[in-house]
UniProtKB/Swiss-Prot annotation:
Top-level division of the source organism's lineage: Eukaryota
Binding of Ca(2+) 2, residues: 130, 132, 134, 141
Species classification: Eukaryota, Viridiplantae, Streptophyta, Embryophyta, Tracheophyta
SMART domains: EFh
Protein's name according to its UniProt entry: Calmodulin-like protein 9
Homology family: Belongs to the calmodulin family.
Amino acid sequence: MADAFTDEQIQEFYEAFCLIDKDSDGFITKEKLTKVMKSMGKNPKAEQLQQMMSDVDIFGNGGITFDDFLYIMAQNTSQESASDELIEVFRVFDRDGDGLISQLELGEGMKDMGMKITAEEAEHMVREADLDGDGFLSFHEFSKMMIAASY
């Protein structure tokens, strides 16, 4: 897991972990995990935090080691990277920069990516993903469409 980070990042994570691990027992609690993550500019929701804990606390003792913490940070970082990539893809399709993707923009963007798509297929895709019925895809609608397509 450590290979997901640079030595400098690992050192930063370790320093943050040690600051919270006041008794130096090598473990932090869920509450302390929240503090560490907030100190590093992360603000996970309660459900996300619970899932992270379930992923690493296999014995159910509520303790998180530094290795567990690195795993959690790697998961969190990869989710952020995926979000950043999705934003970039959205911007590529949103050619006029209005925050919405039209049927024409979707079709042109897909053709630019080497995908053969007809105007009718682009229209169908927008209609299927267009939750508010305005004929355009917002970032939220586009994200849902892309996530559904990946499964």
